[in-house]
Amino acid sequence: MADVNLPPSDSVDNRLPEKSTSSSPPPPPPSSSLPQQEQEQDQQQLPLRRERDSRERRDERDIERPPPNRRERDRSPLPPPRRDYKRRPSLSPPPPYRDRRHSPPQRRSPPQKRYRRDDNGYDGRRGSPRGGYGPPDRRFGYDHGGGYDREMGGRPGYGDERPHGRFMGRYQDWEGGRGGYGDASNSGNPQRDGLMSYKQFIQELEDDILPSEAERRYQEYKSEYITTQKRAFFNTHKEEDWLKNKYHPTNLLSVIERRNDLAQKVAKDFLLDLQSGTLDLGPAVTALNKSGRTSEPNSEDEAAGVGKRKRHGMGGAKENELLSAAPKAPSFTSDPKRILTDVEQTQALVRKLDSEKKIEENVLQGSETEKSGREKLHSGSTGPVVIIRGLTSVKGLEGVELLDTLVTYLWRVHGLDYYGKVETNEAKGLRHVRAEGKVSDAKGDENESKFDSHWQERLKGQDPLEVMAAKEKIDAAATEALDPHVRKIRDEKYGWKYGCGAKGCTKLFHAAEFVYKHLKLKHTELVTELTTKVREELYFQNYMNDPNAPGGQPATQQSGPRDRPIRRKPSMENRLRDDRGGRRERDGRANGNDRNDRSEDQQRGDNDGGNPGEVGYDAFGGQGGVHVPPFLSDINPPPMLMPVPGAGPLGPFVPAPPEVAMQMFRDPSGPNPPFEGSGRGGPAPFLLSPAFRQDPRRLRSYQDLDAPEEEVTVIDYRSL
């Protein structure tokens, strides 16, 4: 029987352990075998190889099937295979066809082992598609504030740096109520609060944007920011009474009633003072506070003159102080030709507001018939004349005196600042007054037309509180909501009748409108319940439509160095710290310790430039920032090479303790800075050897006034 030779050892290793252990490979044939014997053996092995191949195929199919006994007993999933996280030392040659066909599938990289870019870029540890070495986690811009770039050193980074790509810095990226970055989760720092100015906003946009598009985006951002802020303020304070008294339709009904009663009382007192000749025309609310109580005396002169007011048209020192402190009206109001227009316009406003508040018998209102009669009697008069009949005298008001009286009446009775274009329910502070003398203004005509159009719209409009109360809208909504509560009943004697559908009410009426009236008067709880949704919507709309609503004035971000990071020369303390910690950070990254260096950088970014006399730079601004102490190493800092007094930028240098170097840079009022001789400034800040003598000549220094302040070249003389 012919000898059977097994295949080579590499194919045996790829078999199952059972097959490999059942037989051992025979020794190789001796080298003295003849070629004829080898050919005979090959011919004899051909059928055996075919049989072995077919048997191996059956065995491989059996291997793919799970073991019946083991899997039936244990249904738990197989444990995860052990993964070798070590990098392969070298690439092995490709295995033969049989090995590739039956080799196990490639395993995925272990999770959370290494971050890889999936946006058609390269890993940060390799060449970045933009050139240089890019950080591994920088898909949406800088994700750490301050410090140095995370790979291969680099220039110092700043926490306020942002990418300026095409899709970065849009107003949608900032959340309402905050003006921070769009990707705040990666920054690790609090977002800066406040509305960005236009200059700050355009720094967030791409560089190739048009000015008109930038302006449009800023207006959208500003309106969205204010709307979001007002909405949050409203949701916080909407249940408070003071806000409801200003905007809620239900509360406004009682507010309007109290306001009308108070205005009637103040108008009565004002006219009495005018007839007695003791009216004060000052810009303050001196006659009555809007609370309805007389003002308390603030000095001995006022206490002595309680009940005796200043005569009409006469002023004192205190009135002059108030006039100087009051805000000034536009310059066109001082034109003498403007007096007649203002008198007629203020009289029309007095008639309009008095009718809204139901004030009657006001001598200042005048009328068209009286105006024509006065023009006939006083042909030489330049305007309307108001006759004031007192107890013992009769006086006529015209011109500037009449205008001041009308303006004061509008302010104290109706809370209307004529020159300030403001109408409020409570007059507080000082009203606008005319400036002395005419001041030339290039935009006087435009401002004058806007001024007149503003008050003409008020004359044609309605009471602002009545508009916010929206009685007509609420009545229409109530009528629609009360339709199911109006019942139509057939009566054999009287025909059709209409009954009340409220709970427990059995009254009948001849028409449906009487049922609606009955429900609104007798069943107010039902009407209020049905119109609650409409009232709440009006409440919110009234608040949002008021441009001067509380909580609607956004706080702008601090300008100046906070707008843009200042790349100033780093302090000596930071330079020492970077030397001590930079090598350790690079070594940690080389070992794969790339997870905690970001948090250290964030801490350092808030403390760059730790000089107490220096204005620190906070990347995000705002109050309540977290200040973390700078990194301190346990290794003693090496001595610094500092130039001797009088030396140039190339030396000579002497070693100095770091404390002395930092003290010299930290104290600007101390000895002279480096590269300048001490001259008359006193002794040098170093303990020098007698071999180094000071040059008596003072080194001239020059300052380039045109050089940009942000591009400061840092010269490190330690490398020389």
Swiss-Prot record:
Pfam families: ARS2, SERRATE_Ars2_N
A single cellular component GO annotation: nuclear speck
GO biological process terms, semicolon-separated: mRNA processing; primary miRNA processing; regulation of adaxial/abaxial pattern formation; regulation of alternative mRNA splicing, via spliceosome; regulation of DNA-templated transcription; regulation of meristem development; RNA splicing; shoot system development
Compositionally biased region (Polar residues): 288-297
Knocked-out gene: effects: Death during embryogenesis. Weaker mutants (se-1, se-2 and se-3) also exist. Mutant se-1 displays defects in shoot and leaf development. Mutants se-2 and se-3 show adaxial leaf curling, loss of asymmetric differentiation of abaxial and adaxial cell types and development of trumpet-shaped or radial leaves. Vascular polarity of se-3 leaves is also perturbed, with xylem elements forming both adaxially and abaxially in the vascular bundle.
Span of zinc fingers (C2H2-type): 498-523
GO molecular function: DNA binding; DNA-binding transcription factor activity; zinc ion binding
Modification type Phosphoserine: residues: 76, 90, 92, 689
Biased composition range(s): Basic and acidic residues: 48-76, 116-126, 136-164, 368-378, 570-607
Sequence ranges of Low complexity compositional bias: 33-47
Tissues where this protein is expressed: Expressed in shoot meristems and in emerging organ primordia throughout development.
Subcellular location(s) of the protein: Nucleus; Nucleus speckle
Summary of subunit composition and partner proteins: Interacts with HYL1. Interacts with RCF3, RS40 and RS41.
Protein role: Acts as a mediator between the cap-binding complex (CBC) and both the pre-mRNA splicing and primary microRNAs (miRNAs) processing machinery. Required for proper processing of primary miRNAs to miRNAs, thereby playing a role in RNA-mediated gene silencing (RNAi) by miRNAs. Does not participate in sense post-transcriptional gene silencing. Acts as a regulator of meristem activity and adaxial leaf fate via the miRNA gene-silencing pathway by regulating the expression of PHB and by limiting the competence of shoot tissue to respond to KNOX expression.
Family label: Belongs to the ARS2 family.
Protein known as: Serrate RNA effector molecule
Lineage: Eukaryota, Viridiplantae, Streptophyta, Embryophyta, Tracheophyta
Gene that this sequence comes from: SE
